[in-house]
């Protein structure tokens, strides 16, 4: 009945990483046990799936929950699962006002915009879900969400210039 061993089997059964062009899955946190010489009675695992396709995200979450339940039943462990939607993915057309405004601000600073869809979660997701079209502008961060994530001072200064151009254009 080692909860950590059951959790490790569940994680091993999950598909993690980039699953397709629109979908990622990750296990970001695991915690359990009280001491190295005590069989772990409890274990908490936090995982997520992100997709620009809501149905696809739901499928992946279901697979992860199923893997957890199966691993727990194999180890004769009890499992409690809760699923929480943190945000929804979104896409805006290039003709949307905030997309055009961001593109103009970037060009004004000598940067040709690159249009990409991302499964990232930010305040913008909440605004879009509430009916307010918002665009995220990349800030030059490298290796997002990795232990060695970084952004250069030059990239931050460039984003400040772009932000000032957006403010000036909206005045």
Region spans (language model):
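Metal-dependent amide/peptide-bond hydrolase catalytic core
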Residues: 1-171
């Amino acid at each position: 009945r080692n909860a950590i061993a059951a959790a490790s089997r569940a994680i091993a059964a999950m598909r993690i990483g980039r699953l397709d062009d629109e979908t990622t899955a990750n296990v970001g946190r695991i915690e359990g046990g009280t001491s190295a010489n005590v069989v772990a009675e409890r274990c908490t695992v936090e995982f997520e799936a992100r997709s620009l396709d809501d149905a696809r995200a739901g499928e992946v979450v279901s697979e992860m929950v199923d893997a957890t339940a199966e691993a727990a039943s194999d180890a004769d462990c009890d499992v409690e699962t809760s699923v929480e939607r943190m945000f929804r993915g979104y896409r805006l057309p290039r003709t949307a006002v905030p997309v055009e405004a961001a593109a103009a601000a970037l060009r004004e600073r000598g940067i040709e915009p690159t249009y990409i869809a991302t499964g990232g979660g930010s305040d913008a997701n909440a605004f879009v879900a509430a009916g307010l079209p918002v665009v995220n502008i990349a800030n030059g961060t490298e290796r997002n969400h990795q232990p060695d994530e970084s952004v250069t001072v030059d990239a931050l200064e460039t984003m400040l210039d772009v932000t000032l151009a957006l403010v000036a254009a909206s005045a």
